[in-house]
Amino acid sequence: YKYPYNEQLMIYAQRPNATACAEYDFWKDRMGRYVQRGSTGIALIDTSGYQPRLRYVFDVADTAPRDAARSFTLWEMRAEHEAKVCSMLTEQYDVPQDGGIIAQFERVADKLALEYWTEQKRDICGIVADSFLNGYDEDNIRMAFKTAASTSITYALMARCGFSPDGYFEPEDFMPVFDFNTPAAVSVLGTAVSEISQRVLRQIEITVKRHERERC
């Protein structure tokens, strides 16, 4: 979730089971790990220069620790973290805690999806041509975007935090997503979901890691 939407797609297309990706130098210099012989890098497109070029990242599964390597574990949200995470979400986003953490995820997703629409509605309305959104007025585009984005964000938060979104949502909950059925529309929705999910998950990660440090 720490990569932008277009890079998430490229990582998933090449290595759907990847869990934590970084460039060779990060694993070597920052983490004290080496990329194992025979590993294949995941190609990403770097557009930061005058001309696009490929850069490569490696999943943690492609690496192994050297002597005195820094410990590396993916953060995991457990039941003991929920109270701290709920308090953080209330403080950061002014959403109530009643109904449990999943209900709180939904409220946060609703709020941030609407904020994103307010800031980006001109761009969103500019990509409706040839999609199922074509012909909608602005209010209906807003509702379609908010519902599609909020549901997708909640799904992403639940999945990364160890819940089972497939058992929580019904297929019809995702019907608004299918209105975004052109490459431009998919990109707009995917970028929104990626940016918002990243923001919330980074805050959850910080909260979980702080709780673990306080226990030590």
Segments from the language model and where they lie:
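N-terminal accessory/interface modules of nucleic-acid-binding and processing proteins
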Residues: Y1-C216
